[in-house]
């Protein structure tokens, strides 16, 4: 065909694009880099690349009836025959196309052996008639285009095949990537089993590409947002480079003539194309930002020209990118870096000029030594390498930045296994020993808030008052005449509006003998309700009017001392005179003077009674918002240890006040710090005691135990403790002849052993091996 003529001149052009009729799924170029084929669900066309634009040359979707054979998931152009194309159809058919046919329909052969969608097709780089395909059904098939059926079928014994690529240097080798994260290497001469298999990614591996120069380098990309470069020349696949991206990696392509450059595009979210230098994986070397939707296919225009990149996208555009027009993120990046060390050290890296200028203002700091530069770089072509930035590194040791307190606190804290009061007291003592006074005070306040004082037994069952030994008779005897004269006194509670509350339980004898005084003036509560029945329980005397709401809020005059002092009970005539003066005061009504206040006076104090006369405690739920704010304060200050520890100790008392996401963030941060300091036991304890379900499962999902048969050394299956290969039980106890599933102890001389306790009991009475081998064993 005239339109398929080869172009032998040097490639020229500029950044250009053309609109397609439909979104593209894959693109491929011919050997001479003059034409490109675009394939998709509703498009299958060939374009020629002119100096400054694309020209449509051929539409391969012909026929009146639409066919799924034209719905392509992948397309490849043979690099040895310009007239040969292959497509992977979404209905599981592999189709070859012969552009040399004189008819309008260029379809050549159909291979219908796959049962599900074919994800990838690949021609052998040197064998004209060899075609390889990978499908969702988990099989890979090798076709000879001179035959109607496949010549080899490869079963990965795994999930869907995502990509297949022939090695450029090894004639018989190809690589396949799978949905479960594995990569397999196959020899086309041995379809029964793969040559090598290893887990490359955490999740599906969507793509792979062999290095065009180094025969042992294989690049892979997956859903875990990573691009990894593997060295396959060693006995085991070795990861030599890793690039972290911001989205799932859909395509990877090594850049020609640049050993360390690789191009990538994402499957979702990110529409840009990135070119990475795998030696500098933290920032892209170049980016192309022209596409407005997901990029589905990328390919370098010529295998020996690194300047032209072609791409197709779901935005129905086909682009040719010129490398000189690419954006360089390094030009807009901040060349300063800041990082905290594990033990509180602060490292700061900046431009050498910045450090040199700042050092002139700080004569005490040692200037940066130019004899030991951070980066030793050659003088490369500035358009093909990262900018050479000479940086200086300074390390600061901040005062008080030592993290020894964190380790000591984590190791000594008690989080469970004791009553709440003991946990709070223990943790307060730990914080106090480490001179963390605010933390110690916080634990003490938590004990006061959430632990009832009623659990503490009284020092004297007779409720002794003070140190003089004068005891207060039980109030249910109702003989107020026997009370000491220092107690039966006169006081008052000053009210803002003159109405008194029924808070008095001790009254003047004259008032008691007055039968006409049936109610306390200014109160709606009967006096006999306050005092209770003569034969009633003692606690009934302490009841307050908590059920009947008051119409007006009471206002009281607060005492001058917030915490009343405890006084001894003694006869003090001056106290009687003092009380009498208060009773004669014109500001006090008669009945108010007869009431006895709970506020302590100079001569005595009812606070000395071990049991409160009435319940003056607020419920612990009242303080929950305050405790929540306190935990948020510690978290904002960076002390997630305190926030996570209080969450564990208080449990359901405070968990409902804090949203699940915040709790998970605190626990995750604390566990990360513990693991950085290698406090594995404390970390596991926090995971087990965590109140978040997502945290509890951390040590269950990340722990894998591999067991090998002690006889044939082969890995054990998940079916039990019997080896499938040699049909013997693993790790039998020489004493009880059962499988040892826990600690196993054995003799280093004869290699027999068993359960730890069984061997200990056996060796107490015997010196020979319990297996009967005759060896003299010793337990130490």
UniProtKB/Swiss-Prot annotation:
Family: Belongs to the WD repeat WDR24 family.
SMART domains in alphabetical order: WD40
Biochemical pathway: Protein modification; protein ubiquitination
Keyword field: Autophagy, Lysosome, Membrane, Metal-binding, Repeat, Transferase, Ubl conjugation pathway, WD repeat, Zinc, Zinc-finger
Name this protein carries in UniProt: GATOR2 complex protein WDR24
GO cellular component: cytosol; GATOR2 complex; lysosomal membrane; vacuolar membrane
Gene responsible for this protein: wdr24
SUPFAM superfamilies named among the record's database cross-references: WD40 repeat-like
């Amino acid at each position: 065909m005239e339109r398929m003529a080869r172009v032998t001149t040097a490639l020229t052009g500029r950044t250009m694009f053309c609109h397609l009729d439909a979104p593209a799924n894959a693109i491929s170029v011919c050997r001479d880099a003059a034409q490109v084929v675009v394939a998709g669900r509703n498009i299958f066309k060939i374009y020629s690349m002119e100096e400054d634009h694309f020209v449509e040359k051929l539409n391969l979707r012909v026929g009146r009836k639409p066919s799924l054979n034209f719905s392509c998931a992948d397309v490849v152009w043979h690099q040895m025959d310009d007239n040969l194309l292959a497509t992977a159809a979404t209905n599981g058919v592999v189709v070859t196309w012969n552009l040399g046919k004189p008819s309008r329909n260029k379809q050549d052969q159909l291979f219908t052996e796959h049962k599900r969608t074919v994800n990838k097709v690949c021609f052998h780089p040197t064998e004209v008639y060899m075609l390889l395909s990978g499908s969702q059904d988990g099989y890979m098939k090798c076709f000879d285009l001179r035959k109607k059926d496949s010549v080899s079928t490869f079963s990965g014994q795994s999930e869907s095949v995502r990509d297949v690529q022939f090695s450029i240097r090894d004639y018989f080798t190809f690589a396949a990537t799978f949905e479960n994260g594995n990569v397999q290497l196959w020899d086309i001469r041995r379809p029964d089993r793969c040559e090598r298999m290893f887990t490359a990614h955490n999740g599906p591996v969507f793509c792979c590409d062999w290095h065009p120069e180094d025969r042992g380098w294989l690049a892979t990309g997956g859903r875990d947002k990573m691009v990894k470069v593997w060295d396959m020349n060693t006995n085991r696949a070795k990861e030599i480079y890793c690039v972290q991206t911001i989205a799932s990696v859909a395509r990877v392509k090594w850049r020609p003539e640049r050993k360390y450059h690789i191009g990538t595009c994402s499957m979702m979210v990110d529409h840009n194309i990135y070119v990475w230098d795998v030696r500098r994986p933290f920032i892209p070397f170049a980016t192309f930002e022209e596409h407005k939707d997901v990029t589905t296919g990328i390919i370098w225009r010529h295998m020996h020209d690194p300047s032209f990149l072609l791409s197709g996208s779901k935005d129905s555009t086909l682009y040719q990118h010129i490398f000189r027009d690419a954006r360089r993120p390094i030009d807009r990046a901040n060349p300063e870096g800041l990082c905290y060390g594990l033990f509180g050290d602060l490292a700061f890296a900046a431009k050498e000029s910045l450090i040199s200028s700042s050092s002139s203002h700080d004569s005490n700091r040692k200037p940066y030594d130019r004899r030991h530069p951070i980066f030793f770089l050659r003088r490369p072509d500035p358009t093909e390498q990262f900018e050479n930035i000479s940086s200086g590194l300074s390390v600061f040791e901040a005062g008080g930045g030592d993290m020894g307190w964190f380790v000591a606190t984590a190791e000594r804290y008690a989080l469970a296994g004791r009553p709440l009061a003991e946990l709070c007291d223990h943790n307060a003592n730990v914080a106090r020993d480490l001179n963390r006074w605010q933390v110690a005070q916080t634990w003490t306040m938590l004990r006061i808030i959430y632990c009832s004082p009623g659990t503490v037994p009284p020092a004297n069952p007779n409720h002794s008052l003070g140190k003089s030994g004068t005891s207060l008779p039980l109030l249910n005897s109702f003989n107020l005449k026997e009370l000491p004269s220092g107690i039966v006194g006169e006081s008052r509670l000053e009210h803002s509006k003159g109405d008194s509350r029924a808070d008095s339980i001790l009254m003047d004898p004259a008032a008691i003998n007055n039968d006409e005084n049936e109610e306390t003036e200014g109160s709606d509560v009967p006096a006999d309700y306050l005092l209770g029945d003569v034969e009633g329980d003692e606690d009934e005397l302490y009841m307050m009017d908590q059920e009947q709401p008051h119409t007006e809020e009471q206002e009281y005059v607060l005492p001058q001392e917030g915490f009343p002092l405890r006084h001894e009970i003694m006869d003090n005539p001056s106290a009687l005179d003092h009380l009498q003066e208060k009773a004669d005061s014109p500001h006090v009504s008669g009945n108010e003077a007869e009431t006895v206040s709970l506020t302590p006076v100079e001569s005595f104090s009812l606070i000395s009674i071990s049991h409160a006369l009435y319940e003056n405690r607020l419920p612990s739920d009242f303080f929950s918002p305050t405790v929540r704010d306190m935990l948020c304060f510690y978290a904002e200050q960076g002390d997630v240890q305190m926030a996570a520890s209080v969450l564990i100790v208080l449990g359901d008392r405070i968990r409902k006040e804090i949203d699940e996401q915040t709790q998970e963030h605190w626990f995750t941060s604390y566990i990360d710090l513990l693991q950085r300091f290698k406090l594995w036991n404390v970390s596991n304890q926090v995971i087990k005691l965590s109140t978040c379900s997502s945290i509890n499962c951390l040590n269950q999902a990340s722990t894998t135990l591999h067991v090998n048969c002690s006889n044939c050394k082969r890995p054990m299956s998940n079916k039990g403790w019997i080896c499938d290969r040699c049909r013997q039980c693993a790790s039998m106890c020489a004493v009880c002849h059962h499988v040892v599933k826990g600690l196993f102890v054995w003799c280093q001389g004869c290699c027999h052993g068993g359960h730890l306790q069984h061997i200990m009991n056996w060796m107490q009475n015997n010196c020979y091996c319990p297996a009967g081998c005759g060896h003299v064993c010793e337990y130490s």
